Amino acid sequence: MKRQDISENQAKIVYLGIGSNLGDRKKNIEIAKSHLSENNLDFLSISSFYETPSWPDPKKPKFLNVVIKAKFCFDPESLLKICKKIEILLGRKKGKKNDPRICDIDIIDFNKKVLKVKNKLTLPHKFMHKRNFVLIPFFEIQKEWHHPIIKKILKA
């Protein structure tokens, strides 16, 4: 008989960043949010929409970004699969790094877990503390957050 870890199925607090810089950006984000909700994410808070220059090339179309705080009962890899599936469903094409895209869903934090799966997933998001397009909407819904790697409290 396999013994299951009880904490495995308990809800974890996760933060996701959703961005779009192609097509109807707001509609793309709303559709992504709807699909996330249908995939066992229980939204607790959603930031306002923030328009930001494309990074690292501000000549590319501007991004619209939001951050979501949610509860999720499964593991980080399951959440990553859901995010990638939604990006593809919305029409994201595999292109060069930082190319314009219809939908980009990033896991910013997964229950303060520190994880590195080579070329696949790093938690917390390795650049989250350096990017205003993440931090500004993040701080709208979470006034401070302890970064488990750099050991600093990030504040609005």
Question: What residues fall within each predicted segment?
Answer:
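Extreme N-terminal starter segment of soluble prokaryotic enzymes
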Residues: A11-Y15
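Flexible, gly/pro- and Lys/Arg-enriched active-site loops
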Residues: S54-F63, F72-K81, K85-A156
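A structural signal for short, well-ordered beta-strand segments
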Residues: I18, I46, V66-I68, I105-D109
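Short, surface-exposed acidic-centric catalytic microdomains
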Residues: K27-D75
